[in-house]
From Swiss-Prot:
InterPro entries: Ser_inhib-like_sf. It comes from Anisakis simplex. GO terms for cellular component: extracellular region. The lineage of its organism: Eukaryota, Metazoa, Ecdysozoa, Nematoda, Chromadorea. It comes from the Eukaryota. Its main location: secreted. The record marks 46-47 as: Reactive bond. Defends the organism against the host's proteinases. Disulfide bonds join 21-53, 30-48, 33-44, 37-74, 55-68. It is found in: Secreted. Residues 1-17 form the signal peptide. Keywords: Disulfide bond, Protease inhibitor, Secreted, Serine protease inhibitor, Signal. This is Serine protease inhibitor 2.
Amino acid sequence: MMFTPLIVLTLLVLATAEHQCGPNEQWSDCPKCELQCGESDKPCATICGEPKCYCSPDKYRRIPDGRCIRKIQCPQH
């Protein structure tokens, strides 16, 4: 029975680790829209996407490095 606490601890660590987001990102269980540099006119989905970290509402995803940045930092702004 000594393995039970170890298993619980491992599951807890794994569950919290997947919610670690990068700078200017936040976790959502139901992301619907994420702005991307160069695609500000792209319509947003009305259904939930896959749970993930996505850019904060006032930030844009820069391609190809995937960082979340201010709109003015987007290439060719």
